[in-house]
Regions:
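Short alpha-helical "packing" element that flanks the helix-turn-helix/winged-helix DNA-binding module
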Residues: 171-179
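A short alpha-helical element within helix-turn-helix/winged-helix DNA-binding domains
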Residues: 188-199
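A short, conserved structural fragment
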Residues: 214-224
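Structured interaction and signal-relay segments at domain junctions
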Residues: 2-11, 17-97
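Juxtadomain coupling helices with adjacent low-complexity linkers
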Residues: 2-26, 30-31, 35, 119-168
């Protein structure tokens, strides 16, 4: 990398060094916008065209479409489709008279987004291409690290959810199926006695099931007296795991 590019990226380097994978995308793009050509806005776009973060030149639009993009938080589908076909850092023009520089963002050997520099009066040179290429590589690494952590967290939640379900008896699993069928969203108020009557089970089965899942840390359960029982799901995978191994309800006599 040239000395000029290194100097222009100093703020960007400082952010990466100080924040690492915890750095905010908006802060990175602000640093990139400072390093970019004059009158240029910078966008971080996912593969579906959604704007993850952006940095605008002096807080104003550098081109006619910036305000629309920022309000909608996405770029037009036709432009995004064109960006996804670009496999290397490319400078082009013609989109509403704007000059654009796009750098593909790759993570885990797959395309995960695009880094886009755009402005009607932007003049992109060799240094800008070097900056865009380096930034796309480092941002791809940051995104990949976060995706890996999310997958690890999801795997851990699945493991905890399955372990919690294994602690339940058959009757308690059926009770929780009835509860989740009635629960709208991830939290709500339930009347255990009514659920027990509808399910043909005793209230104690429901109480025991909730106590076990609360002890496992996958739900929060709190009695509100005559009002019922407040339930909040803490583990986002617990409902999916109940559905994955769902038991059919016994047929009622008559």
């Amino acid at each position: 990398m040239s000395i000029v590019a290194l100097k222009r990226l100093k703020q960007y380097f400082d952010l990466l060094q100080n924040e690492g994978s915890d750095v905010e995308y908006g802060d990175l793009l602000t640093a990139l916008q400072e390093a970019a050509a004059d009158n240029t806005n910078v966008y971080l776009i996912d593969k579906n065209g959604k704007i993850i973060a952006y940095a605008a030149d002096n807080g104003f639009s550098a081109s006619a479409f910036d305000e629309e993009w920022i309000v909608n938080q996405r770029i037009p589908d036709d432009l995004n489709n064109s960006l996804l076909k670009i496999g290397a850092v490319t400078v082009f023009d013609g989109y509403e008279a704007a000059k654009m520089l796009v750098a593909p963002i790759v993570g885990g050997s797959r395309r995960i987004g695009s880094l886009l520099f755009a402005g009607e009066d932007s003049k992109f040179g060799d240094e800008d291409i070097i900056i865009a290429e380096f930034a796309a590589t480092t941002i791809g690494m940051v995104i990949s690290n976060r995706l890996d952590l999310m997958q690890e967290d999801e795997a851990q939640e699945i493991k905890l959810a399955r372990s919690a379900i294994k602690s339940l008896s058959y009757s308690e699993i059926l009770a929780m199926q009835h509860i989740f069928d009635e629960l709208d969203g991830n939290e709500g108020l339930l009347v255990a006695s009514r659920i027990a009557d509808n399910a043909g089970i005793t209230r104690s089965v429901i109480v025991n099931a909730l106590r076990k899942l609360a002890s496992a840390g996958v739900v929060e359960s709190r009695s509100l007296g005559m009002k019922g029982t407040y339930l909040r799901i803490l583990n986002k995978e617990i409902r999916n795991e109940f559905e994955r191994q769902r038991y059919p309800y016994p047929k009622k006599d008559g």
